Amino acid sequence: ASPEAYVEYRKQALKASGDHMKALSAIVKGQLPLNAEAAKHAEAIAAIMESLPAAFPEGTAGIAKTEAKAVVWSKADEFKADAVKSADAAKALAQAATAGDTAQMGKALAALGGTCKGCHETFRE
């Protein structure tokens, strides 16, 4: 695959993850009565986070204007660990949603958002 294909893939994957977060936020805030659907959104985020490190192979830094910092590649193990943390947090949210525990869903969504923020602070422009 071309480096450009990897860049496009990760842009789309991260956009999808963000869109799932927006949907989850609306559900958790009670704007939509779709608690049963929340687990699906959380599971999608977990899947994206699990696959994300593979979308940043060597040779794809600086290919196009992106928000990824060079530290993604120089601290690849830390980047992978952050992706795992996000995946685990998304799985915890899915479990809370499956159990119908709205209070725990709110806590789990906040925890997931915290993992996203932590990764963004280190690895995103």
From Swiss-Prot:
GO terms for biological process: electron transport chain. Binds 1 heme c group covalently per subunit. One of its GO terms (molecular function) is heme binding. InterPro entries: Cyt_c/b562, Cyt_c_II, Cyt_c_prime, Cyt_c_prime_subgr. The keyword Iron applies. This is Cytochrome c'. Coiled coil: none annotated. One of its GO terms (cellular component) is periplasmic space. Keywords: Electron transport, Heme, Iron, Metal-binding, Transport. Homodimer. Heme c binds at residues 10, 67, 116, 119-120. It holds the Pfam family Cytochrom_C_2. Cytochrome c' is the most widely occurring bacterial c-type cytochrome. Cytochromes c' are high-spin proteins and the heme has no sixth ligand. Their exact function is not known.
